[in-house]
Amino acid sequence: MAPKTEALAAWSGGWLGSARHCPSPNFGPRPAGALIDLVVIHSISLPPGEYGGPEVFELFTNRLDWDRHPYFDAIRGLEVSSHFYIRRDGTLWQFVDCDARAWHAGRSSWRGRDNCNDDSVGIELEGLEGDEFEPAQYQTLAGVCAALAERYPVAYVAGHSDIAPGRKNDPGTGFHWARLRSELGWPSERFPRPLNETAGKA
């Protein structure tokens, strides 16, 4: 099936030209010979369920004031990052060069390979597990996936919950896998679950 979504603007190294850039210090080199063939989809909001603030940017750049909100004490000292972050309005931000290893997956495994940070690109959606995502987010997400597939041998898309089952639940039941597949025009084999499941229906 031909892709329905065009890839976003050109690359400059591992930086996507159509994204706004906010470099994070939380990254490292990928292992020699790493095959970047997986896109991992996450959801995040800080504090949980609150949208539009600067807290995700501050977390990914190690500038979050841990005392600003009671929830932040539970993540105090956390150093994480994602390659991309898509806000509710579809605005795309990039924190880490895709040629580098972002710190988004944690303890994880996919198709027999552990440590998914080594060979994946992480994309955070502004949202809360169980909540619906915005049409603009799906459109931007599909464009990023298409762009990644032009630059890297991307073969699969999975949720954080798929690579860390029992430990992570995002992006959650509000994420519609069938909608992403429809936007991309990719075969169902590239996605983590049967697309006729309730949570996967558009």
Predicted regions: what is each one?
Residues 43-44, 125, 161:
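Residues immediately flanking
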Residues 2-17, 32-33, 114, 118-120, ...:
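Basic/polar, cationic surfaces and motifs that engage anionic cell-wall
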Residues 1-114:
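N-terminal catalytic cores of peptidoglycan-degrading enzymes
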Residues 41, 123, 141:
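Conserved, mostly hydrophobic/aromatic
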Residues 92, 120-125:
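Internal catalytic-core helix/loop-beta-alpha segment
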